[in-house]
């Protein structure tokens, strides 16, 4: 029997503000592709500026998926992301197009590409409610500390403000006696697709300057008003507003900090997140990195993807 043909998928990863969006559009045009967002926060409607969603002008006719599919008060899991994205990959492939995942959120992308099994077996609604109550009464740091005690690897990977994932990891340990980190390590480490993993990186100081500038531009574009709209709708304690760009401005509306302090914290958190993104991708995935410090490498990256996936670009026809 011949080997089953695996679906071809291009994946563009890298830290925030490095230039993934433009590259993804350029590759989609050249390789007859359609784009799937690999960002866990771009799924939320009305959260456009803070999540740096692709604009109507930038889209330039290229279909985009996994954007604006949930309301901000709704929750969203890695398992649901995995299911939806794999469905999009099938459908895009069936149309004779190339799926291009762009992100973003390391665990989410990894869950799609590798044989991660998410089941409802490890679930305890009563325990989950107890942990949620603890998080509200004693703070997210308290619950995160409990996770550090039983599963330090997951605690290192999951930020304290990501309360849902912290509690999920605790719930898995509570019900199965196994660490979430151990469960993930045990799972099959083989790619499910024929993947071209493209990573963008640049000089750290330049990246940090770009991040600071991006925050200033977001404020000019109306980030304050965008967050105020969510705040005035009464959206509190939701997964969506834990996103960088929202929690900092929420602190301003809660009179915890001045606007200047909120913007400064947003820049700091964005830079830290970029560093965490790079660390994650370098440790968890076999990525071919392209340094774009001195400018775009679109032609070079296009040649690499053509070769890796054995494709012919529209540019070479």
Curated annotation (Swiss-Prot):
State the UniProt keywords alphabetically: ATP-binding, Magnesium, Nucleotide-binding, Transferase, tRNA processing
The broad enzyme category this protein falls into is transferase
Residues binding substrate, per UniProt: 16-21
Q: Where does ATP bind?
A: 14-21
Residue numbers marked as site, Interaction with substrate tRNA = 105, 128
Entry cofactors: Mg(2+)
Pfam families recorded for this chain?
A: IPPT
Is Amino-acid biosynthesis among this UniProt entry's keywords?
no
Q: Which NCBIfam families match?
A: miaA (TIGR00174)
Family the UniProt entry places it in: Belongs to the IPP transferase family.
Oligomeric form and interacting partners = Monomer.
- Protein name in UniProt: tRNA dimethylallyltransferase
Q: Which organism is it from?
A: Bacillus cereus (strain AH820)
| Organism taxonomic ancestry | Bacteria, Bacillati, Bacillota, Bacilli, Bacillales
Instruction: Identify the gene encoding this protein.
Output: miaA
């Amino acid at each position: 029997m011949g080997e089953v043909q695996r679906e071809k998928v291009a994946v563009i990863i890298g830290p925030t503000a490095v230039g993934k969006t433009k590259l993804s559009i350029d590759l989609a045009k050249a390789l007859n592709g359609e784009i799937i967002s690999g960002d866990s926060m771009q799924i939320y409607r009305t959260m456009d500026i803070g999540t740096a969603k692709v604009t109507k002008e930038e889209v330039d006719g290229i279909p985009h998926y996994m954007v604006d599919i949930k309301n901000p008060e709704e929750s969203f899991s890695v398992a649901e992301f995995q299911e939806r994205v794999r469905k999009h990959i099938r459908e895009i492939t069936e149309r004779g197009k190339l799926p291009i995942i762009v992100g973003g959120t390391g665990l989410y992308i990894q869950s799609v590409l590798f044989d991660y099994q998410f089941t409802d077996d490890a679930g305890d609604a009563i325990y989950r409610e107890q942990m949620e109550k603890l998080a509200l009464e004693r703070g997210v740091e308290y619950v995160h500390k409990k996770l550090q005690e039983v599963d330090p690897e997951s605690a290192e990977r999951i930020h304290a403000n990501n309360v849902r994932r912290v509690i999920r990891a605790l719930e898995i340990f509570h019900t199965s006696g196994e660490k979430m980190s151990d469960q993930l390590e045990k799972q099959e480490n083989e790619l499910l697709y024929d993947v071209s993993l493209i990573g963008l990186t640049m000089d750290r100081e330049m990246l940090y300057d770009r991040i600071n500038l991006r925050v200033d531009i977001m404020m000019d574009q109306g980030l304050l008003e965008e967050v105020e709209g969510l705040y005035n709708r009464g959206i509190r304690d939701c997964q969506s507003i834990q996103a960088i760009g929202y929690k900092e401005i929420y602190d301003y509306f809660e009179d915890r900090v001045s606007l200047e302090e909120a913007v400064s914290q947003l820049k700091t958190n964005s830079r830290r997140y970029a560093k965490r993104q790079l660390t994650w991708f370098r440790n968890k995935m076999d990525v071919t990195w392209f340094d774009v410090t001195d400018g775009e490498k679109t032609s070079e990256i296009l040649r690499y993807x053509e070769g890796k996936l054995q494709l012919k670009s529209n540019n070479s026809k």
